[in-house]
Amino acid sequence: MNEETKRMLAKTNTQESEEHKRRVRRICMSMPGSEEKLSHGEPTWFVRKRVFVMFANNHHNDGHIAVWLPTPQGMQPILIASFPKTFFRPPYVGIKGWVGIELDQVSDDDLALHIHEA
């Protein structure tokens, strides 16, 4: 088994995924008016029917345990270029300026900052 395969298997571990999901849930639910619903099989958080965070656990076997969220206009390429191990362009919503954030690469404080900006 090559290193990339090992990395993907380790990252999609259910226990690790659940721990990250709890982190994200705690931050998202601290937002006034936040609601959690399942969307495409994953927890997604809304404020006034607007999505602001999507949880993604190994979406289409991509190896990421991440959140996808919108960023201020023009920030997506800057974040990805500056911190390529932390940020990536997610499928579907990346074209709209959203980023994926690798949850094992970001502190709770930094994650909360990005979620609050979303």
Region annotations inferred by a language model:
Residues M1-E117:
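Charge-dense, helix-prone N-terminal extensions
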